[in-house]
């Protein structure tokens, strides 16, 4: 495999964009209770790519869901971009997620009836952008990710790597300061996985985005500024970092 540029050249900013204090997520009660996330403390400034490694069921996906406001913690404080997510109403939280957090999942959903460009335009239109402005920005993002010849293609006519790049472009449409990626290379072949890893690194290197990735893919350690391991809902530095 070709080596990626090393992450040591990155210069994170001091201000924390993501901050967790004694965060817990418990399912069930009593003796059957499951601590999916158990007392996690974490601070992430702008310009970091944090990789969270761990086996299935370790709590890493639940942790990302808490940071992304997809779940509410049982206890503790989750702050993103200076906002305590626990203090936001459901409507305010949904609006916050739309504008402040970009999500990239292993099993992403693109709308089969829309073109690649229209899929990327969707969050822009939801945020109130004019149709022409949304189209121009979507085309800019797709061209940036090497998809200038695929603007009018529908998902069923794209390769797996191309679809993942469309999903990443859509996640970036509203310039969110935080990107959350759950197994972003999990369904891709080696070459396309490497391309997505390079794009994630580029977001940090060029734009000082804060990127949090949960994955089994150790190739991402080459571009991460920090590598953590999640086991039994707790975070520790990875021993192979």
Which residues does each predicted region cover?
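ABC-family P-loop ATPase nucleotide-binding domain
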Residues: 1-26, 236-241
């Amino acid at each position: 495999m070709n080596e990626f540029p090393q992450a040591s050249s990155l210069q994170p900013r001091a201000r924390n964009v993501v901050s967790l204090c004694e965060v817990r997520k418990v399912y069930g009660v009593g003796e059957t209770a499951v601590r999916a996330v158990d007392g996690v403390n974490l601070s992430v400034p702008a310009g970091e790519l944090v990789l969270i490694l761990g086996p299935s069921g370790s709590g890493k996906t639940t942790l990302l869901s808490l940071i992304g406001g997809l779940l509410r913690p049982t206890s503790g404080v989750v702050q993103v971009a200076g906002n305590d997510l626990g203090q936001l109403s459901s409507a305010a939280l949904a609006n916050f997620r739309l504008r402040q957090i970009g999500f990239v999942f292993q099993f992403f959903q693109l709308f089969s009836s829309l073109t690649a460009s229209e899929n990327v335009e969707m969050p822009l239109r939801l945020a109130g952008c004019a149709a022409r402005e949304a189209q121009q920005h979507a085309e800019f993002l797709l061209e940036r990710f090497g998809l200038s010849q695929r603007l009018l293609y529908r998902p069923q006519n794209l390769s797996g790597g191309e679809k993942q790049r469309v999903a990443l472009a859509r996640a970036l449409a509203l310039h969110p300061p935080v990107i959350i990626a759950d197994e972003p290379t999990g369904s891709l072949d080696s070459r396309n996985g490497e391309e997505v890893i390079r794009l994630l690194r580029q977001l940090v290197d060029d734009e000082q985005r804060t990127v949090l990735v949960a994955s089994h893919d150790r190739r991402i350690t080459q571009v991460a500024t920090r590598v953590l391991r999640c086991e039994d809902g707790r975070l520790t530095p990875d021993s192979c970092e």
